[in-house]
């Protein structure tokens, strides 16, 4: 691996148990006479809600004050529920704040007006953390890089970035008295912030000393940039989370295991008995004619529908396509037992952040240092040398009291490689031109609640241009369902895990790693292809591997493509994961708002979130919804609820989306693409499409006029992702495509899955399906879209 796991100095965990305007964290109390400008700010009618202790404790998000020093994760007080089902606990497994969610500021007193705030909010990016040697890297501009909006209903200010913040980066925020309350008067500060701001009392010990030092350091940076620090009523520093580090580190560790030409996965992971020595191998069965294969395919009957076979067979020309079933052996990082939906990924290595903290602790440095030495690890290289970091794989470090140094094994930038739980024989379908062995191949990934077998509906269009198509099931789908109930085919929430958000994230992360793993297997298994329909596939001699994703498969595919654009520092390693092009249909980014804003999934998800967010809603559901499904129950509630009741459940949705996106940002396509674009361009040729008014994956998500339902929805849906990628929009008004960067918009006669097969009983969308398939085959044949036709009025 070229990239190493970056360590930064982290501030102490700062949820204080005794800090106010005159009390330090050790309990000593003294009267403090504040500077006159602080006294004035304390006496204002409307003040920031920032309290470090007591029943009204409140820290605006995001903040350095809610991070754990020893492992670099968020640390938000969870209340009584300390299980992973608590979103606040789940957020504690993340190594920084989200990059696509807003910043929150709560106020109390006279209140705020509904307003766009044009002055008094300052947001800067720093070169280093506040415990290092920071300087200003970028001055973000209000109205350009972010917008600040105040709400009379909630007395909140939301600061919404217009583009994703940089991952693994440091930011500081300041609010000054230029911001006005509902009466036009300047907002003020809180007692807790006054204690940190004042120079009349400097704390020398305890957590409050660290808080004060950081706060005054932040204000000093703003002062040097021209902001009057005497007018600052609140400031903070925060670190953003890493994005796609686990994808990168897992690719790098895998590539290093094959660097010698043989499989050394067991040596690298230090895990035996799981079958890692045969991982990334492909086994193929005997080719069968398409018609015979589909007719006999019970999985198609189960997961797609036996009634759909006749229509597909009716469009098939006999003896033109072969279907071969087979398996690819892929590492599985999720659980399959009783904890399948409660246990997220676990790291294969102890956290570098915890090791760093232990080596700085006089009580632990000898104990931990000697174990590292015994493992052949040079601690002087550990922070910067990727090969040295790999030596931590499979290692358990024990503290002087006999307990594990890192029992949680959270996946973070400090411990990014996941532990393998099993090696699975993942079934696939391979479609090839009859009797032929194509030189190029397309990996297809289906959408949520369906299965790989839906490729039967369109694969012949790709084989007709000389391509092979290989399709696998997403985790917990199709043949990869754990059983009939632990299956997204019976309940999408088996995959979209709303109860354990870290598992929901890792279901998606596993899916991306599966695509990358299948891609690697197509390179590593090449010697096994002799005499099979894959005998023509040899990446080393010029074979091209392309990606095709629909819906959730497109979400997975987009993140996989963006990740594959990052070099591992070795031509051979990069060749294991390269894609020459990608076609993404009806997909999008910022998954939490995408789902909440989905006409199809939104009501079901809102119902399940509201059950825990609102006792009134739960009471309503218990009384009124015994015979209704989840979506119908929620829709009935919205038709009957008061504005106050709707506001309560909406607040719950906002809390859920913030927590969910905090977990998802690390692998969300919008975040992964943004991070890649910030570190060099995305060079893979792309073809995207959408249908107008898509009911499953929304084109975009926006708040109703005058209300705030979704947080930072400007990143959610298909169109924001297409815009981020710089794609050329093609529609009825502009039919000339960009060969390698097109985004084609179809009109609303087409439906979400028209790409797979016509959805209208009267075939009103048949022409749309045909054009979608024609364009996709055209693009995937050579990574270039030649033409788009609107002769049948299919475009928006």
UniProtKB/Swiss-Prot annotation:
Induction info: Induced in the presence of LPC.
Oxidoreductase is among the record's keywords: no
Lipidation (S-diacylglycerol cysteine): 19
Any GO BP: lipid metabolic process
Disruption phenotype: Mutant cannot grow with LPC as the sole carbon source.
Record-linked Gene3D superfamilies: alpha/beta hydrolase
Keywords: Cell outer membrane, Lipid metabolism, Lipoprotein, Membrane, Palmitate, Signal
Pfam families assigned: Lipase_bact_N
GO CC terms: cell outer membrane; membrane
Lipid modification (N-palmitoyl cysteine), residues: 19
Leader peptide range in chain numbering: 1-18
Annotated membrane topology: Lipid-anchor
GO MF annotations in UniProt: lipase activity
Localization annotation: Cell outer membrane
Highest taxon listed in the record's lineage: Bacteria
Function: Required for the utilization of the prevalent host lipid lysophosphatidylcholine (LPC). Functions as a lipase that cleaves exogenous LPC and generates free fatty acids, which are then transported into the cell by fatty acid transporters such as FadL, and used in various metabolic pathways.
Similarity comment: family membership: Belongs to the AB hydrolase superfamily. Lipase family.
NCBIfam families for this protein: lipase_Pla1_cef
Name of the protein in question: Lysophospholipase VolA
Species in which this protein is naturally found: Vibrio cholerae serotype O1 (strain ATCC 39315 / El Tor Inaba N16961)
Gene: volA
